[in-house]
Amino acid sequence: MKKNMFIAVVLSVLVLVGASFLQELLYPSASSSHSAAEHTLSAVPEETRTQSAHGGAADTQETTQPAAHPSGQVLVFPESETEERVERTYVVRTPLVQVTFTNRGGDILSYQLREHYAAQRREYVEMVEQARPDHRAFSLALGDEYAPNVNALFQVKQEIGARGVHSIGFYRSVATQHADGTRTPFVLAKRYVFYPDNYMFELHVSLSADVLEEREDSRQGAKVRAVAETNAGPATTVLARANGFDFGTASYTLRTPPEIGPERNAADKYEFRTFMVGAGGKAKTYALKGDGREQVDTPVSWASVSGKYFALIVLPNDADSLKRLVLSAPQAETAVQHHIAFVRRAVAQPAVADVYRVYIGPCAEQYLSAYNVASRNPYGLERTYIDAVAVSGGILYPLEVLLKWLLRLFYTLIPNWGVAIILVTIAIKVLFFPLTKRSFIAMQKMQELQPHMQRIQERYKGNTQKIHEEMAKLYREAQYNPLSGCLPTLVQMPIIFAMYRLFNNYFEFRGAMFIPYWIPDLSLADSVWTLPFALPVTQWTQMRMLPVLYVVSQIMFSKLTQVPHTEQQKTSMTIMTYVMPLFFFFFFYDAPSGLLVYWTAMNGVTLVQQLVMKRTANKNKT
C-alpha cells in the first residue's frame, strides 16, 4: 500500500511538471470615438518644495556648480535670466491619456490611461510606477547608461495644433567645461507630441550647438565657434569646438520608467513582466529575473516591457543611431523592476535630432495591429509587428486565433464574456464528442476486462514477466488497445492549453462582469465574503466560491470515471480522486475568474456527457 501511494504521488508530481514543461514548450520565453471638445492642454504651474518620489525637493535657484561626469568631462547647467528657477508640473489630457510632466529634466511623473481603471478602484490605471528623483519616466542622461540623469530645471513651451495635436517641449542650456576654463555650450531639448484617440506619442530629443560665428582660435589649434556668453554663465570665455556630442562614447541615454503599471499585487502569481525586442521582422523575448541585465548591441526596430494586460513599447526612428540597448531587472526594496535604456551613439555633427515613438496602453492585438498599416495610424507606420507583444506565440497561435473568433462570435450574440466562455467550452466539447465517446468506450472495455486482469495478477503473483505476457494476450484476444483511452485526451491537450493561455490573458476580460456582486471582473479572482482578518498559513482574506465549485466538479468527474480497482490500488485511487483536486484548489484559489469559469464549465460539460453515455450504455445492456 505504501508503495502504491508513493507511486501515485510521484506520478502526480510528474504530471504537474510535465504540464509546466509542455506549456513552456508551447509558449517559449527566451519569455470607441471621443469628442474633440476634450482636447485640452492644461499647464498647471505648481511651485514644489516638498520631497517626493517624482521630483525631489525643488530649488528656488538653479546651481551653477560644475558636475563631475563618468566620461571625465564636466557638465555645467548655467544660470541666466531666461532659465526656469522653480519646479512646476504640467498636465496633458487627451481622450485616452492623462500625462503629468515636471520641468525638472522634462520628465514624465505620471501616465494614466483614462479608459481603464485600477483593479477594484475607481482610479485610472497608472503606467509609471516606482519613479524617484534619479529615475523618472523618459529621463535623459548625457552619456551612456551609467551616466546620471539630467535633473536641472527646463524652460517649457506648449502648443495645441491642428486636429487637436498636443505638443509640450522642454529646453535647457548646458555647457561642457574644459580644463582651461572655457566652456562649450549647447541646447538640450525634449518635445512630446500627442495625437488624440491614440495610445502612441512622439518624443523628440535634440542636442544643438548655439552657434553665432566661426573663427580660428590659437589655444585650441582648430576651428571653433564663438557663442553668446549669456548661455554659459557670467565672466566665462566661451568656445564651442565643432566636434559634436561625445560624452564617453555616447551622446545620451533615454530611460523608460523604473517599472510599468499597473501596480502589482505580490500575491498575484498570474501577473508578470517581460521584455521583448523586435529586429528584422522577428521578435525575441527576454525573461530576466532579479538583478538580471541583458545588452543588445544589434540594431533594433522596437523594444518593450509588457505585463498581462498593458505594455510600453518604444520605436526609435533610426535604429542605427543606437549604440546599444540595455534591458534591466534590478531588485528593488519590494519588487523587481523592469526598464530599458536606449544608448545613443556619439556624433561628430553640431546637432543631434532623434525621434522615438512610444506606445503606452493595452497589450491587445486590436490596438497594436494598427501600427502595421499606414492608413490606420497618424504616423504612417507600417509593418512594425509590435503586435507580437500581445501574441503568445508558439505552435498554438492559430488555435488561439480561432478561439478568439469564437469568443467574439458568442459575445455578439450574448454580450457577456462569462457566458461566451461557457458557450465556447460547450462548443469545443461538442466538437470533440466523438473522441470523448471513444475514450468512454475504452473505459467500459477496461471495466469488462478488470476481473480477468485481477485473476492473472493473482495467478502469477510475483512473476512480473508472466503477468505482462498474459496481459498482452488478453488485450489481443479482446481486441483492446490500452492506449485507446488516452489518445483522445492527448489529441485535445493542445486545445486545452490554448484555452488556458487565452482565458488567463485575454484583454477583453479585464473589467468584464459575469455575475454582479459575485464575479464583477473576469480578470480577477471572485469573492463572496471579505474576512476581517487573514487566515493562518494561507493569509487569505477573501472567501471564494469558484475554486470550491471547481473542486466539487473535479471530484464528481473523477468518481464517475473510476474503473473497478483492487485493494492494492485503493490508496492511489483515493489520492487521484481527492488529494489532487484539493491540491488544485490551493493552486487555483487566486486564479482569475475567467480561467476558473472555463475549468469548471469544462468539468461540468464533461460530467454531463459521461452521464448521458453511461445511461445509454446501461440501456443497451438491458
Curated annotation (Swiss-Prot):
Lineage: Bacteria, Pseudomonadati, Spirochaetota, Spirochaetia, Spirochaetales
Protein name as annotated: Membrane protein insertase YidC
Single GO molecular function: membrane insertase activity
NCBIfam families tied to this protein: PRK01318.2-2 (NF002355), yidC_oxa1_cterm (TIGR03592)
Subunit: Interacts with the Sec translocase complex via SecD. Specifically interacts with transmembrane segments of nascent integral membrane proteins during membrane integration.
Subcellular location: Cell inner membrane
TM stretches of this protein: 6-26, 413-433, 483-503, 513-533, 579-599
Chain segments carrying region Disordered: 37-71
Topology relative to the membrane: Multi-pass membrane protein
Organism: Treponema pallidum (strain Nichols)
Family note: Belongs to the OXA1/ALB3/YidC family. Type 1 subfamily.
Entry function: Required for the insertion and/or proper folding and/or complex formation of integral membrane proteins into the membrane. Involved in integration of membrane proteins that insert both dependently and independently of the Sec translocase complex, as well as at least some lipoproteins. Aids folding of multispanning membrane proteins.
Name of encoding gene: yidC
